[in-house]
């Protein structure tokens, strides 16, 4: 909506105005560009705001949302009074007809009429309803429109909104602080927000109520004439014609006889009394908003809050304009914790890139070679049409993943820590650097470290955006010729760098195609077109094929099992509408729970685990699958406790508790599903269930022993030491407990700064990469199990009890200081 909504009852399409400007009658002038006040939210034409302003605003609102103060007619000919911007007594509820005898009382004639009106189309300034008023007011430049036109417009708008929701790139749009950005970009939204949510103007209300009272006749908006018109209409309605005539003579004003079925003065005063008592109750329900989120939005709107994504952002510099011997900090064994800011770094980027050894894992990777000629780039033969070793990225092997799984509590990165791994150097010995330097290390002229590439592509969204990264790669691709450099040397150097850029771009598209919005894809196509025009057809073909492959595979699941899934263990009454989940075998319940939870786990994207998105109100929209899996975990835990405490007898509770213990055991030992096992164990350890002493004693000895083993292996002692050891030995498919990774990521995020001396802390990103890459490795191998719709449906519709109700039942079933013989 590009124009402010202005509700008017006049038929000529004119709106309320103040000195020729459009005015919203319910506005306090706090929105930017307000015609009531441009310099200050509380300055009304140089006069001090008063309580009468609040009264006026409340007078202008009815239950239907129509404006009761429309443009006033001062004579029967319809001439407007230019000195009065807001008029009264224009029938917004429909014209009923004018009284033939002025001396008669409209009150007695229309005592049985509805105060809302007949809803017919009134003549002149009448209106058939608030929809028509809204339509004519919002289109006052072109005259009034019919209802059908307004509804048609709304349908078109609704269709556009549906298209927006169906847009595949909708979820890629940054929605953090969207309220603040919308209000700043569209000032008319502020006006609408103030109408429907007056509590957001608490400061404005407080200052107005605390101000001194002034008389209505000095009010710059309502004015003396409008108040007199209200009084005259009230006298007319009550049949006090003599009093009306005396007032007209004294005030030297003539009352144009309008026909109303109510006293507008009384009606509006009633609204004032009702609304003034509950002025802060006229708000929308904000209970769905986190208090921290509301605080951040409020601070951001005032310009006092800095978005983390914008923190430490420096002015962009072309990648070749940045000095080679600066903006990078290397890891050194003798590195101090706090290096001096004044000591420049002397090592150049080129030296670093050529002296490090490539990762040993490169030999295990498949490569794509597009031979354009018989020459090879590694032999330093110059050929612009040759592409060599466009390596495709391969995920870390399971052995490496198991070695990377920590068996001890995560430790924070120190400034003296080297970025190395079990298989040798994983990347350049860089602790921190500028974005340009990191991109140069990503596309070196000679040696190329694939592990560094995987780390960068997985973690880059924690310090930049896909748009900026693509821009930097394009800058890197266009290699300038240095002063004094021969054409042959320049071509040889540019060919090496361009091949690296294309290699990174191909890997990026292949492994992280979800990062590419429609805008980015168009930018890549533009780059490919420029490559074709310069004769690099083969270069363009490799990237084009990768792009087309990503578009075809988007949203597909290409997993193919060579072995058939085990036959489901379904009960005989599987087709019965009385099917009970506890009549299903524990093994099959474990399988269906595993399938449902793994589907959510496999959908988690690497970006959902960056910057603690799942734990920050304004960033939670970036982690939908993480939050869904967390919610599912809590749901299973609550379901476990609810199911056990649904039975008043000890033997029944023991039977259900034993069933859950068997489900957790099968998930952990046979399916490597530690997440669901942990959720069930969490329900068993809930305070309402844990205290059920007699129920646990009723369990068979073998079941009690299994319960003890679960407690041992899934214990949180020593940062889940036993669980980490068990996970390292597990073979895929596997569903790890997500909570451990979230804990580690939180430790890495909060224990290490994002920037060191203003440069991106890449060492921190390497630590985070280790945890996220582990999650990705478990996502690759899916479970070969057969889903059973009837059982899965039962496992989705849990009936859960609140914590208070659970504990109340627990105390009722097994009271304190009671003997076993005293309990059912």
Swiss-Prot record:
Gly residues composition bias: residue spans: 117-128
GO cellular component: plasma membrane
Ranges in coiled-coil conformation: none
InterPro entries reported for this sequence: LisH, Ras-like_GEF, Ras-like_Gua-exchang_fac_N, Ras_GEF_dom_sf, RASGEF_cat_dom, RASGEF_cat_dom_sf
Entry keyword set: Guanine-nucleotide releasing factor
Domain called N-terminal Ras-GEF: residue spans: 426-551
Any one Gene Ontology BP term: Ras protein signal transduction
Swiss-Prot/TrEMBL induction comment: Up-regulated by Pseudomonas aeruginosa, PAO1 strain and PA14 strain infection and down-regulated by phagocytic stimuli.
SMART domains: RasGEF, RasGEFN
Biased composition (Low complexity): 8-41, 104-116, 136-167, 343-354
Signal peptide range: none
Annotated GO MF terms: guanyl-nucleotide exchange factor activity
Region (Disordered) residue spans: 1-51, 65-167, 330-354, 398-425
Biased composition, class Polar residues, residue ranges: 83-95, 413-425
Domain Ras-GEF: 585-816
Annotated function: Promotes the exchange of Ras-bound GDP by GTP.
Protein's recorded name: Ras guanine nucleotide exchange factor I
Gene: gefI
């Amino acid at each position: 909506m590009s124009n402010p909504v202005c509700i008017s009852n006049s038929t000529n399409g004119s709106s309320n105005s103040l000195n020729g400007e459009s005015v919203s009658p319910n506005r306090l002038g706090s929105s930017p560009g307000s015609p009531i006040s441009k310099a200050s939210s509380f300055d009304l034409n140089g006069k001090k705001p008063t309580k009468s302003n609040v009264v006026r605003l409340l007078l202008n609102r009815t239950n239907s949302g129509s404006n009761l103060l429309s443009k006033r007619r001062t004579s029967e000919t319809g001439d407007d009074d230019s000195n009065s911007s807001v008029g009264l007594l224009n029938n917004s509820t429909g014209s009923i007809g004018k009284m033939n005898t002025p001396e008669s009382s409209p009150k007695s004639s229309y005592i049985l009429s509805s105060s809302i009106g007949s809803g017919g189309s009134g003549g002149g300034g009448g209106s058939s309803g608030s929809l028509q008023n809204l339509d004519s007011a919002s289109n006052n430049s072109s005259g009034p429109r019919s209802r059908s036109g307004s509804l048609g417009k709304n349908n078109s708008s609704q269709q556009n909104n549906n298209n927006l929701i169906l847009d595949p790139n909708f979820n890629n749009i940054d929605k953090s602080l969207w309220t603040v950005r919308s209000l700043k970009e569209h000032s008319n939204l502020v006006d609408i927000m103030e109408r429907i949510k007056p509590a957001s103007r608490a400061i404005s209300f407080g200052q107005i109520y605390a101000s001194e009272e002034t008389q209505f006749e000095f009010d710059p908006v309502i004015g003396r004439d409008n108040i007199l018109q209200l009084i005259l209409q009230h006298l007319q309605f009550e049949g006090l014609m003599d009093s009306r005539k005396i007032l007209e003579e004294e005030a030297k004003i003539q009352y144009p006889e309008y026909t109303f079925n109510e006293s507008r003065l009384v009606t509006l005063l009633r609204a004032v009394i009702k609304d003034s008592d509950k002025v802060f109750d006229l708000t929308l329900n904000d209970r769905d908003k986190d208090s921290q989120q509301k605080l951040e939005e409020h601070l951001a709107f005032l310009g006092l809050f800095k978005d983390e994504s914008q923190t430490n952002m420096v002015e962009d510099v072309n990648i070749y304009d940045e000095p080679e011997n600066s903006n990078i900090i290397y890891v050194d064994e003798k590195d101090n914790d706090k290096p001096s800011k004044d000591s420049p770094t002397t090592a150049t980027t080129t030296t670093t890139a050529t002296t490090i050894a490539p990762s040993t894992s490169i030999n295990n990777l498949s490569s794509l070679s597009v031979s354009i000629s018989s020459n090879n780039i590694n032999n330093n033969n110059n050929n612009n049409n040759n592409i060599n070793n466009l390596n495709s990225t391969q995920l870390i092997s399971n052995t490496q993943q198991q070695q990377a799984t920590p068996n001890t509590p995560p430790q924070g990165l120190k400034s003296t820590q080297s970025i190395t791994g079990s298989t040798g150097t994983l990347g350049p010995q860089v602790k921190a650097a500028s974005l340009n330097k990191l991109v140069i290390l990503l596309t070196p002229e000679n040696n190329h470290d694939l592990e560094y590439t995987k780390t960068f592509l997985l973690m880059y969204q924690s310090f930049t955006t896909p748009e900026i990264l693509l821009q930097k790669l394009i800058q890197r691709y266009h290699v300038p010729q240095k002063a004094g450099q021969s054409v042959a040397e320049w071509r040889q150097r540019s060919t090496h760098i361009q091949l690296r850029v294309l290699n990174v771009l191909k890997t990026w598209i292949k492994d992280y195609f979800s990062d590419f919005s429609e805008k980015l894809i168009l930018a890549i196509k533009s780059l490919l077109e420029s490559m074709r025009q310069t004769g690099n057809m083969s270069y363009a073909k490799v990237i084009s094929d990768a792009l087309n492959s990503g578009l075809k595979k988007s949203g597909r699941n290409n997993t193919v099992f060579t072995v058939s899934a085990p036959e489901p263990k379904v009960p005989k009454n599987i087709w019965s509408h009385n099917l009970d989940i506890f009549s299903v075998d524990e093994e099959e319940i474990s399988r269906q729970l595993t399938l449902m939870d793994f589907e959510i786990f496999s959908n988690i994207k690497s970006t959902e685990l960056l910057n603690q998105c799942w734990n920050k109100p304004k960033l939670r929209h970036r982690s939908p699958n993480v939050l869904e899996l967390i919610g599912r975990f809590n749901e299973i835990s609550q379901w476990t406790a609810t199911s056990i405490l649904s039975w008043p007898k000890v033997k029944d509770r023991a039977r259900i508790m034993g069933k859950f213990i068997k489900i957790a055991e099968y998930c952990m030992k046979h399916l490597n599903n530690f997440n669901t096992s942990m959720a069930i164990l969490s329900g068993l350890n809930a305070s309402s269930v844990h205290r059920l002493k007699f129920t646990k004693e009723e369990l068979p000895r073998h079941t009690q022993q299994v319960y003890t083993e679960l407690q041992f292996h899934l214990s949180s002692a020593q940062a889940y030491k036993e669980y980490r050891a068990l996970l390292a030995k597990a073979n895929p498919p596997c569903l790890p407990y997500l909570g451990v990774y979230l804990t580690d990521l939180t430790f890495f995020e909060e224990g290490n700064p994002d920037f060191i001396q203003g440069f991106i802390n890449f060492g921190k990103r390497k630590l985070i990469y280790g945890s996220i890459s582990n999650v990705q490795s478990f996502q690759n191998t899916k479970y070969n199990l057969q889903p059973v719709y009837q059982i899965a449906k039962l496992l989705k519709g849990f009936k859960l009890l609140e914590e208070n109700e659970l504990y109340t039942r627990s105390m009722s079933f097994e009271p304190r200081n009671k003997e076993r013989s005293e309990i059912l």
